[in-house]
């Protein structure tokens, strides 16, 4: 299969491309959700010995869900820089230690989005968190012990992956 044409068909808060894919003698028309690159982090507060997640309303499930801190990479920003910014915006912490868990396509059948997932250790809260007012973010912070986090019925894929990584570490 080979992409022979690409055209932006929607350019709003998110972007959608229309691709023409050559498959032998057949040309297929496919839509591609193109939100950009994102970062996420499982955050551990070493001073309080608690994992800190977020809860906010999400359009996909049309509900509030618990998930790890996450956000979009701005322009040519490095993933490490973006995740530090997002942790401060959403949770109010400065990052002490950062470890990459995985770079992944969360939904490669329909989306070009790539998410880099990190583990972050924090100990200094220098902001309020809760998200940015200008982005209309209303983010609640949730604290978990390791045991309660491992038992939490999570539904967000990047969060499930980060918590499974934690479980495998022992």
Residues of each region from the PLM?
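A short coil-to-beta-strand element that immediately follows conserved catalytic motifs
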Residues: 2, 94-101
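Short, solvent-exposed loop/turn elements at beta->coil junctions and helix N-caps
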Residues: 7-9, 102-107
């Amino acid at each position: 299969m080979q992409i022979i044409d690409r055209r932006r068909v929607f350019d709003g808060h998110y972007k959608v491309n229309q691709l023409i894919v050559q498959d032998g003698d057949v040309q297929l028309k496919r839509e591609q959700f193109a939100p950009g690159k994102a970062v996420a982090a499982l955050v551990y507060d070493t001073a309080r010995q608690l994992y800190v997640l977020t809860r906010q309303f999400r359009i996909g499930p049309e509900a509030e869900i618990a998930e790890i801190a996450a956000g979009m990479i701005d322009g040519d920003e490095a993933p490490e820089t973006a995740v530090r910014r997002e942790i401060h915006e959403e949770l109010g912490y400065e990052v002490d230690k950062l470890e990459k868990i995985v770079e992944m396509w969360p939904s490669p059948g329909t989306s070009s989005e790539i998410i880099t997932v990190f583990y972050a250790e924090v100990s200094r809260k220098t902001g309020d968190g809760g998200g940015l007012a200008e982005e209309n973010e209303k983010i609640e912070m949730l604290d978990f012990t390791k045991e309660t986090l491992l038992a939490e019925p999570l539904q967000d894929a990047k969060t499930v992956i980060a918590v499974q990584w934690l479980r495998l570490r022992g």
